[in-house]
């Protein structure tokens, strides 16, 4: 077939329009499509002239008037973002030296905060009231936690076998062999370590218990005078002068899911009648060229289908500085001063229009609120693991979120998404400086959300959780290994954040947030050390010959003490602290109605199964988190490349690769304890058998078939599955639609397909002036790329080509005009099938 005829057939035109085009050569086709008759000195630049026509043919409903502009060199450019109005946003250096700060205070250089001056007297009184209440509550929490820990630690001390120093004669230790002395001291050393670790871990569990208990009481009473949601009635008109940007930072995400959720969210906003108060910004940091092209296509389709011209924008950064926080900062610098508020969305976020307008109303009603965090509900996943986790977060999550609000009030958490932020103070106070020094805990901050909340509060602005505001949703990882990959990043980020514990001006609550963030992961190695020391103490106790007579002519032996009744009481108390929040959660559901959870029997059975599941997974997470903490401290780079999975299930090979060492540890541990003391194995059984079963649990729980089966049985049912809100129904509907027209191998199609090449060329960001040096570099890039097979063209080189409109035009022209010369590319493209629904044809 004539390659020119084949090219014309690829254009989304009617047969009559195709017949009108010249079929002599590719240059003639582009010249005919070039309505402005650009004079090009090079044949391979002629596709630049036809970009406008090819775009209008493929996406006529996506292009607003004036959206196709000319750059400084007269090339067609698709204006995907509004005109920038820059603001200055720069970080203050971190001051972590408390001695230097104390010296400044002695010299009178500390400046008292003056943020209350921007509030009216009534607002100042309200602010002071909740701050006083919050302080009293936190001291109460501290007292309850410490008192409980002291009592439990004392009980723990009484049940350990070696009481006091009665089994050691200090006078004999100086005259005997060093090894003998060490073996006499070893049980006491191990017991001291056990007691210390027990105290820390019990304190951590106790804090969670009291948080859940207060949350239970708040939700049971249903009345909270300090809830920020109570500050509005919910139907106030939005101030047209205060506009809101919905920003979604994305990086190599599932394009179909991202744009399905975003479309459902935007249509929900339009249904409220308040769409004029909002704009949407898709801020891409994607570096996979195929995904970059797919994002551009999905953006064009979204604009056409929701009539979002002039309100839905897309930008891909070429320089990915500071990851997600840098992406948000970049938005604030360029467009932030055009908006009063911004709502940060994750790639899997879905929010109703009522929730978004409600957040704006809360900002309007609370002029000293800097961040208001909604409480996102997990939904939308089908694997057994994800459904179990969805159920757990839906049932237990509200207690802990309400409890956090009870203790923290306006000095609360920010989780980085599904939250509204006041833009101006964010620009002024929340830029993040890199952490000084070298090593794994220096450089750009990874977990930016906690730090931004701390900086916002340091500047005097409130950070609230609207825990009772409905309509906010997110998705969870589909399987255990995907969750652990996410935990690895969060672990490193929280360990880095702890360096800010002593930074100047941080509120004590946010210092505690940094501490709890560290403990979320540091508790794993502490628990592992506790188990290891307990095992070592049992080994010493079993293998060491006891010395009952320590003094000459001693009449009565000194026995090691063991009080099993106290051990059982302490164990029962610890289990109550761990599992009572789960019981309170189910009681709350029983009281308020369990129909949406499958009914009384099914929700109760689901709870019991979830408890069993959490017991099986806790030791597995413990070992993984221990590895994450140790690797972070040692500066190890943990590379975790998982294979592609069609249904998000974990292959057996990967499961044994990731869990094999845990399984081996469990087998050795169980065998050793069975040989040493079968009674001690009974206490360790939940730990060792969970490790032995870890590969099997990981694989089985990752399967959608198991999850869908429990869904049919109405187990792990959540309200969003029983009666799905419209925004989630729409998300699923649009996801099916997007999957049916998805674009794979986007970069290759951007080189060959006329429509996708026009889109990539028009959205390319490297808009340089004419330069002989650049021309030489472009020719070199194009020649090097075409002289290799597409498979050998790495990601970075593809990105360089994709970012330059001229290189994309020249690649496009050459592969079509000289297919014999570039046969490796043409043959490769012939093996790739373009989804016929990926682009509309006339």
UniProtKB/Swiss-Prot annotation:
Coiled-coil region(s): none
Q: Where are the transmembrane segments?
A: 141-161, 194-214, 513-533, 570-590, 615-635, 680-700
Q: Which UniProt keywords are given for this protein, alphabetically ordered?
A: Cell inner membrane, Cell membrane, Glycosyltransferase, Membrane, Transferase, Transmembrane, Transmembrane helix
Q: In which pathway does it act?
A: Glycan metabolism; osmoregulated periplasmic glucan (OPG) biosynthesis
GO biological process annotation, one example: glucan biosynthetic process
Described purpose of this protein according to its UniProt entry:
Involved in the biosynthesis of osmoregulated periplasmic glucans (OPGs).
Q: What is this protein called?
A: Glucans biosynthesis glucosyltransferase H
User: Which taxonomic lineage does the organism of this UniProt entry have?
Assistant: Bacteria, Pseudomonadati, Pseudomonadota, Gammaproteobacteria, Enterobacterales
